[in-house]
Amino acid sequence: NIEEILNSTHKGVEASKIISKSNYGEILELCRQTAGCYIHSTDPRKTFEVTEQERLEFWEKLYAEPGFGIWQGNFSDMLTDRTANALMSAFLAEKIRSRVNDPAVAERLIPKDHGFGTRRVPQETGYYETFNRDNVHLVDINENPLREIIESGVRTDSSDIPFDVLIYATGFDAITGAFERIDIEGLGAKKLREFWQDGPVTYLGVLVADFPNMFICMGPHSGLGNYTRTAEYSVEWVSDLIEYVVENQKARVNTTEAGMDEWTSHVMSLGEGLLANEIGSWMTGVNRNLADKQKPKIMRYSGGHPAYREFCDKVKEEGYRNIVCT
């Protein structure tokens, strides 16, 4: 009962806890079955298999709903077909124009260097309306680059902009960045950061040949999707492997070069044709602050998490194929 919960009565709070947990199992099982481990499944239809009216009605429905449905529950070719993606991006551009009063500001807010869904999707409520406020001003640093931080704020090419508070949002060095910050050294004094210089190579996104007992959870080449759900499986799989090693009185876990090459090739093959892998973003390992991370690379397993689990489970069933325990 909403009134009870809003009134914060003991009874209402306790009832809300019971109600919210009543379908946990169903939700978790649904997430296990979808490619991205969300509650949404890709629509099997393609963008141009429906009429324009049907397409617009479908998109309006997705746009009005909360959550990742517009990204994870869209037409099946939305992230692989350029024309389909451009059409979806144009639909969203019109939504931005309708919500932002100043046409010039609206145009600045419409992405020009990537299509919808090829970078992390913003889940917002009232974000675009923020730019209709008198005390909010948008500066496009592509048109007016930042030059330096000064005592009163920031300096751009054209002016000094004063601030009371400056919040840094410079991005993050994702996928491989955390591993490269550590001086990880394997057999034969092999450095991981040097070994991955041209892109990561792994076995299942878990092991790297000649780096024994280094277990990676949620790093490159692992199952892409809802990290809370995918991380759970990754940790459980690695835990089972460690338990297997202990039970068999082994001390070192390594993978074979052949297994690593096979898996990496599989990841590369699955990533071909995915529009997101052509775009510079954290998901493709691009960090504009680092000179050696300017070009997008295929960093993630994109075959869907159910397929990833099936592959890893089969490796386990076969006595940990391509994994050497000594």
Feature locations, PLM:
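N-terminal FAD-binding dinucleotide-binding subdomain shared by FAD-dependent oxidases/monooxygenases
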Residues: 1-326
